[in-house]
Amino acid sequence: IAIEVSVFHGGEPDEHRWGISDIGALDSWATRVWFQPDEHWAFQVSHGFLKKPEALEPGNVRRTTASVSWLTESDAQFTALTAVYGRSDKDHADSFSDALFVEATRRFSPHVIYSRFEAVDVETGLLLGTTTHMGSGHAEPGTVVALTVGAMRDLPQLGGFELAVGGDVTVHKVPAQLVTIYGSRPVSFKMFLRLRIPVSSMGRMQNGTMMQPMREHQ
């Protein structure tokens, strides 16, 4: 079990991004509890209080998250599953804002396949440009849903650098308020090239701990 606690200034930076010398009062806090019963499972719960984070919106924000992860691995193969839930409660809002995230990854060297499901409540007024400040004029909240499926393949190393190429496709479902802008079923895709610097003898960080290099990297 691990417990984390932090105290900080909750206000977001204004348009003067470099004016960071005046951090403001330590008026906000967050705490997180981790529980890892064995090498396969990890659980966490967190809660935070943000004192007036937005200068143009009244009130405070309370945020809560919970997640569970499962991992099994052997040599150059692994399977990982993660589910995360989050909720934001704004003083000036009429309801909670929820988010759900589920991801699965399967590696069977040199291939990786992955999928991701996301459902997020959004303030549609921000996207429509109809939101006014001081807590009025907010459009009805809506939920954006996205499903992503992708794959990646490792390439031969180049001077110790790890290369991989991959791509994925995402299908979205948007609330009725946003259909006129984004369509009812927006689809996006991307291709990417991944580059990793050579692994040191200490290995990489994974799940908050050091992971030794795989055999082909030593």
List where the protein language model places each region:
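Outer-membrane beta-barrel "beta-signal"
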Residues: V149, G183-Q218
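Transmembrane beta-strands of outer-membrane beta-barrel pores
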Residues: V7-P13, I20, H47-P53, T72, ...
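Residues that define the transmembrane beta-barrel architecture of outer-membrane proteins
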Residues: A25-W29, N60-T64, Q77, D94-L100, ...
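Residues on the lipid-exposed face of transmembrane beta-strands in outer-membrane beta-barrel proteins
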Residues: I1, V5, T31-F35, A66-W70, ...
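Outer-membrane beta-barrel translocator/channel fold
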Residues: H47-L56, F78-F101, V112-L147
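Repeated loop/turn-to-beta-strand initiation elements of outer-membrane beta-barrel proteins
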Residues: I1-I3, E39-V45, D75-L81, P110-S115, ...
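Loop-centered beta-sheet repeat module
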Residues: A2-E54, P58
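Outer-membrane beta-barrel translocator domains and adjoining extracellular loop/strand segments
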Residues: E15-D22, L50-V61, H92-A99, G125-T132, ...
